[in-house]
Amino acid sequence: MTTPLTAFGHDPWWLVLGKALAIFVFLMLNVLVAILLERKILGWMQLRPGPNRVGPWGVLQSLADGIKLALKETITPGGVDKFVYFAAPVISTIPAFTAFAFIPFGPVVSVFGHRTPLQLTDLPVAVLFILGLSAIGVYGIVLGGWASGSTYPLLGGVRSTAQVISYEVAMGLSFAAVFLYAGSMSTSQIVAAQDRVWFVFLLLPSFVIYLISMVGETNRAPFDLPEAEGELVAGFHTEYSSLKFAMFMLAEYVNMMTVSSLATALFFGGWHAPWPLNMWAGANTGWWPVLWFTAKMWTFLFIYFWLRASLPRLRYDQFMGLGWKLLIPASLVWVLIAAVIRTLQNQGYAHWTPILVISSIVFAAALVLSLRKPFTTPHIRALRRAAAPPGQAAAHRAGFHPGIPDTAAAGESAGGRE
């Protein structure tokens, strides 16, 4: 079922307002649930109960935290640029919510007698618009770090800038193959192109690259370098408290939902029902697709929680090397392969599908196997042993450091003299 672009822009004002309000409520409720579930899942994975004090089984903990932040005293550090300091959380939050206007939740439905798509609006370049909004949201992080007048927030903002520049390139290149096979950059048209086969099965390398890039784009573990507590206290929001801090956290979780929803729309069929539910004739009609879409989005949110509980934070050089040395070159090569196979399809070659699937699996496997390469650093002691003459091999045993006396060797010499 295709939703043409001409279906947008004809809703009455009250229906547009109702859609916008529904998206806002949907995001706010999902943020409350996501924060609670993240803390619960982390607790279960770390063999502890997690939040269990406010409400039955701790289900009201997120609401209590939000009320607490709203009622806390607003503390403004001395020496800050007040206008930029207060504007930064707003700049981060507004683009995060705006991006959801282009996410398709379902097909055309009837609302009080009006036929309308379950999407606020769409554009011929909607995916690029979402990519641009995510880049604008980073301005809030950079400005917040700069306006705080402190070293740690400034370093967090600079890290965030480098992170977005690096991983938005890889993310954009992962979209290119999707645009080639969907024939459109509109989110609703891309979802319609996956009516029979989801793009994750045809364009697996694009999905793997996007999956890694979306974690880096949202500053989440193991790529949470802009707010690394062991290095930068709390990063760009070190000097923020009360509602301003809550707005930064809200923007972070809404951005997680935005990139998760975009992954659902671009690679997992959007609101189309998964197998075997798609065998039911009514699975992709009415309001049921909203349920399928939400379930897919939450699958990606669970991956976020799982990664945070499982993987340690990367070093900054490892993180940047992953983007520039692996993801971007791999994206360029895969786009070239996908374009060649698309050309074969356009020229009427009958067996383009198995060629694309096999190429996709082989390239994705090679990409996953290459993920360790940017992280491996030659062991300095091994290099020292290899460079040392044979007679000095004993001097390079474990525990030896240049400029530090080898106490064991000194003791042996003293014993020999006695």
Curated annotation (Swiss-Prot):
One of its GO terms (biological process) is aerobic respiration. It is found in: Cell membrane. The chain crosses the membrane at residues 15-35, 83-103, 123-143, 164-184, 197-217, 262-282, 287-307, 321-341, 349-369. One of its GO terms (cellular component) is plasma membrane. The keyword Transmembrane applies. Pfam families: NADHdh. InterPro entries: NADH_UbQ_OxRdtase_su1/FPO, NADH_UbQ_OxRdtase_su1_CS. It catalyses: a quinone + NADH + 5 H(+)(in) = a quinol + NAD(+) + 4 H(+)(out). Keywords: Cell membrane, Membrane, NAD, Quinone, Translocase, Transmembrane, Transmembrane helix. PROSITE patterns: COMPLEX1_ND1_1, COMPLEX1_ND1_2. It comes from the Bacteria. One of its GO terms (molecular function) is NADH dehydrogenase activity. Residues 394-418 are annotated as: Disordered. Its main location: membrane. Its EC number is 7.1.1.-. Coiled coil: none annotated. It is a multi-pass membrane protein. NCBIfam families: PRK06076.1-2, PRK06076.1-4. NDH-1 shuttles electrons from NADH, via FMN and iron-sulfur (Fe-S) centers, to quinones in the respiratory chain. The immediate electron acceptor for the enzyme in this species is believed to be menaquinone. Couples the redox reaction to proton translocation (for every two electrons transferred, four hydrogen ions are translocated across the cytoplasmic membrane), and thus conserves the redox energy in a proton gradient. This subunit may bind ubiquinone. Belongs to the complex I subunit 1 family. NDH-1 is composed of 14 different subunits. Subunits NuoA, H, J, K, L, M, N constitute the membrane sector of the complex. This is NADH-quinone oxidoreductase subunit H.
